Amino acid sequence: MFNFIKYVVEGKEIKTLEQVKLSYARDALEPVLSEDAIDYHYGKLYRTYVNRFNSGEGDLDFNEAGAFLHSMYFPQLQIPDEANTPIGASKEFIDRHFKSFENFKDEFTKVAMGLQGSGWVYLAKNGEIKTIVNHQIKNDIILLIDWWEHAWALDYQADKKGYLTNHWKIINWNIIDARL
């Protein structure tokens, strides 16, 4: 299993968080996510959570959770594939809980579009689709979609549904399998 966030805790002293490295070039997710969007989201926003936590600046719980959630989000992305569908264990999991990938996407979209404001939408290990309305560390995440404006507004403006629809083209199902 991936070690999504690396930090050492000795007593109450937290030493450092590290930003996960991308396994793809910043322009590799185009046209689903632009290089500009990745530069801002990964290169500035995510890095800021890590840096603020490491410097003890601001709300440490918020910054740690923001770093954690982004460390779950970015590794699950890959170069776009129009025919991208779940494989292996993730396919079996989705079929067991939702009967089909299409049903899963419909249910995920329903939950995401029902989330008022910003947050995260994720598939949990118990088969439920859940939301996080602010930054919180969760230990049951299988697949996670960033639903904050910074994730979609640059490329999709007000088309949140289009952002989600296109996201299925860039999910790396091997990573999702590893989380099961």
Roles of regions detected by a PLM:
Residues 2-180:
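Feature for soluble, non-membrane regions of globular proteins
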